[in-house]
Each structure stands twice: as structure tokens, then as C-alpha cells.
């Protein structure tokens, strides 16, 4: 399990939101930063990514993904698959300890530093140390309330921050 962050993506109707907390943890017991931004817009704002894991590895994965998005004209699935294929062939890159959630108007993908691309069955996906807590909260809110995606994502992270010591309530949300 990767420590130090929680990222959640929530899709409902024609909207999708990605939210992340701001905590960066060093080792087992030191908080280095409270207000880190782990959510980014790519490809002229048409794609949102959120990353979890080792900071350097997550940034490397995000940068490589951005290059593939540019190369394949913003095609999210194609960029993810091409990145995964490159990743699996490179012995050094395969060892990256990072996960990335990437969304556009149509698709939600989980991309791992080990070269896997997964399209979730549900309209909600969570990663990072508090990902399962946030995902459970978001699923409950998604299917049992009239909240929009941004509010669901934010509330899910607030709940996760009360359970997971590696997640804080300094939340960034981006919506398409």
C-alpha cells in the first residue's frame, strides 16, 4: 500500500471530479507538507490526473503520461495503453511505486507504475493510503444522495481523512 495520499474520482451523469488531499508524509511518522497539489489538468484542461505513491515516482508517471497524451492527440485510452506497454518493457520504470487516476469526459482509468491500465466497473475509484475509505464513502454518497460529483469527492476525502493518518483534509478538487 502506498502511504501519504488519497485520490478519488467520481463520475455522475456528464460530470467527473477528481479530488486529492494535501499531505506529504516522509517515512512512517513525519508530515512534510500539508498543502501539496496532487491533482493536475493536462492536455489543454481536457484531462485530469491525480497521483499517489512515492512523490518522485508519481511525478515521473504523470509526466510520461502527459507526453503520451500529446503524442496521441488527447486520446486517454490510447495514451494509457501506450504508456503501459512502454512501462512493461523498461526494467527501471517497472519498479516505480506510483498510481495515477486519469479522467476525461468519457473515461476513468487507473494507471499503475507497474504498467497496468484498469477501467473501473463503478463510477468511483480511489487510490492511495485512504483510497478504500474514500471509495466506500463516495459509493454510498453517489448512489444514495443528490450531491454533485464535486461535493461527493470532497465529502469522501473528508471522511477518509478522519480514518487514515496519511490523509489530511486540505482538499483539492478539479471537475470536467
Swiss-Prot record:
Keywords, alphabetical: Allosteric enzyme, Cytoplasm, Hydrolase, Metal-binding, Protease, Sodium, Threonine protease
Location within or outside the cell: Cytoplasm
GO MF annotations in UniProt: metal ion binding; threonine-type endopeptidase activity
Active site: residue positions: 5
Binding site for Na(+): 161, 164, 167
Metal-binding found in the keyword field: yes
Reactions listed under catalytic activity: ATP-dependent cleavage of peptide bonds with broad specificity
Enzyme Commission number(s) from the entry: 3.4.25.2
One BP term from GO: proteolysis involved in protein catabolic process
Enzyme class: hydrolase
A Pfam cross-reference name: Proteasome
GO annotation, cellular component aspect: HslUV protease complex; proteasome core complex
Family: Belongs to the peptidase T1B family. HslV subfamily.
Subunit structure as annotated in this protein's UniProt entry: A double ring-shaped homohexamer of HslV is capped on each side by a ring-shaped HslU homohexamer. The assembly of the HslU/HslV complex is dependent on binding of ATP.
Function: Protease subunit of a proteasome-like degradation complex believed to be a general protein degrading machinery.
Name recorded for this polypeptide: ATP-dependent protease subunit HslV
Organism: Thermoanaerobacter pseudethanolicus (strain ATCC 33223 / 39E) (Clostridium thermohydrosulfuricum)
Taxonomy of the source species: Bacteria, Bacillati, Bacillota, Clostridia, Thermoanaerobacterales
Gene: hslV
